[in-house]
């Protein structure tokens, strides 16, 4: 019997701090999934949809957040984020966080022909969501403010905690949608797209984390119009890059070259 070296069997995980954020919110996660599917061939789309069963790609992308109210899944609370003190680097550990879970899910999914369909579906649900989470900079942020959740801000058009502003409010206020995201995607240099497609979760995390100075570039807890305008562009870019990378994972696993 083959032993699976990496598995994501749903084991109880004990965490001392559970981040309360919902990266990108419902719309943002839907956009990541929709962008990814626009970049897949019909055959790969069909395979992925087959494993998702009765779930749409939008529902798959939001599943981890939708289940937050279900105590059965409390062990997943720490899987959405990673906290690193400012100026420090990530220290690999056995703890279940966004990096370790995403890496395990991607590795697990590559064995999809050898594992049960429900396990493939589980891996897809994790990957669809966590790729999105990883590209929200505050999910790779600082424990001191709980990824921006404890910082209250105001602005001409949005207000609340900094994390919620980045999750949903700028997306809603600026009307970021699939058409605008695909227009941005189509404007990218093909060489940049190829670079984005390389699967390396650690590099993805550091790229998101490099945006934290931009996230915190305000004074007196006030976000002026320039902040909102500039960071709407950053958010759109992050959503598109997340979609490109989700598509890359799916193509790498289920694409024609893999299966033919």
What are these regions (language model features)?
Residues 4-16:
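Sec-dependent N-terminal signal peptides
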Residues 20-130, 140-260:
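N-terminal, motif-rich segments that launch catalysis or mediate targeting to/interaction with membranes
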Residues 1:
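Structured alpha-helical
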């Amino acid at each position: 019997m083959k032993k699976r070296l990496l598995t994501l069997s749903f084991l109880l995980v004990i965490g001392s701090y559970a981040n309360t954020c919902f990266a990108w919110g419902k719309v943002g996660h839907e956009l990541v999934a929709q962008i990814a599917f626009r970049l897949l061939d019909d055959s790969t789309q069909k395979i992925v949809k087959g494993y998702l069963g009765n779930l749409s790609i939008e529902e798959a992308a939001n599943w981890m957040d939708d289940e937050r109210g279900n105590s059965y899944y409390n062990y997943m609370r720490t899987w959405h984020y990673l906290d690193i003190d400012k100026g420090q680097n990530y220290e690999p550990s056995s703890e279940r966080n966004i990096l370790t879970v995403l890496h395990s899910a991607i590795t697990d999914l590559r064995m999809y022909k050898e594992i049960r369909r429900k396990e493939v579906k589980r891996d897809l649900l994790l990957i669809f969501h966590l790729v999105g989470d990883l590209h929200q900079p505050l999910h790779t942020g600082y424990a001191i403010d709980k990824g921006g959740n404890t910082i209250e801000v105001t602005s001409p058009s949005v207000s609340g905690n900094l994390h919620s502003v980045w999750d949903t409010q700028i997306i809603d206020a600026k009307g970021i949608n699939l058409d605008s995201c695909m227009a941005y995607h189509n404007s990218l240099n093909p060489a940049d797209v190829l670079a984005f497609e390389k699967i390396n979760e650690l590099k993805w995390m550091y790229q998101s984390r490099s945006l934290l100075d931009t996230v915190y570039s305000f004074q007196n807890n006030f976000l002026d119009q320039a902040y909102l305008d500039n960071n709407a562009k950053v958010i759109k870019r992050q959503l598109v890059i997340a979609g490109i990378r989700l598509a890359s994972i799916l193509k790498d696993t289920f694409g024609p070259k893999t299966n033919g």
